Amino acid sequence: MRCLYLHGFASGPGSAKGVAFAEAFARRGVEVERLNLRVPSLAHLRLSAMIDHVVATIGAAEQVVLIGSSLGGLTAARVAERVPAVRALVLLAPAFCMAERWRARLGDDGAAWRRDGSIEVFDHAERRPARVDVGFLDDAAATDVGWPTVTAPTW
């Protein structure tokens, strides 16, 4: 059975959580593949592309477990809706209804994001400021509609 770790927003496969999961599972003889979900890039991040990337990575696998943190948790749940090979999910603070919550929280900053076309965020993987275009928010709003319908056991 394959086990994939999906990192959160502005993070990467080398995140502390991803490394901790990989090391803990390795001690038990299980390899955790830590995917890079910065697709096509952090600047032009798209939830739909993240989901497609995970689906393509799973490919013809018969069984897979997805571990997702924040945006990676949302991605994992949306993948599980589409891929019967997902046998279980471990979700850490999944970012369900993310676009809706971000719009409410950002207020004037959200309006500036739309006006300017991008917003500055802290890139945790690169440890520096970076910009993400507003297409990320629009794509998330179109892709993350309603609560995910997941039938796989979820923790």
Model-assigned labels for residue ranges:
Residues 67-76:
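Gly/Ala-rich beta-loop-alpha elbow adjacent to hydrolase catalytic centers
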Residues 78-82:
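Active-site signature of alpha/beta-hydrolase-fold catalytic machinery across serine-
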Residues 85-155:
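The alpha/beta-hydrolase serine catalytic core
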